[in-house]
Swiss-Prot record:
Primary role: Peptide with insecticidal and antiparasitic activities. Induces irreversible paralysis in D.melanogaster when tested at high doses. It shows a moderate antiparasitic activity against the major pathogenic nematode of ruminants (H.contortus, EC(50)=41.3 uM). Does not show antimicrobial activities. Does not induce increase in intracellular calcium in mouse DRG neurons, suggesting that it does not induce pain.
Lineage top rank: taxon: Eukaryota
Lineage of origin: Eukaryota, Metazoa, Ecdysozoa, Arthropoda, Hexapoda
Tissues with expression: Expressed by the venom secretory cell of the spine. The spine is a cuticular structure containing a single large nucleated venom-secreting cell at its base. It is an independent unit capable of producing, storing and injecting venom. On the back of D.vulnerans caterpillars, spines are grouped together by 50 to 100 to form scoli, of which there are eight in D.vulnerans.
Main subcellular location of this protein, as a coarse class: secreted
Disulphide bridges, residue numbers: none
Residues of the signal peptide: 1-19
Name the UniProt record assigns to this protein: U-limacoditoxin(7)-Dv63
């Protein structure tokens, strides 16, 4: 069985990677808006 701390760490990493993807999408949209 996983220790609770390991599960928490995996959850945080998963959420962070999703947030990074969403942030990258927003950043690219904003960059396109200002560059063009």
């Amino acid at each position: 069985m996983f220790k609770p701390r390991v599960i928490l760490l995996i959850t945080i990493i998963a959420v962070f990677s999703e947030f990074k993807k969403a942030f990258k999408g927003l950043f690219e949209k904003a960059a396109n808006k200002y560059l063009h």
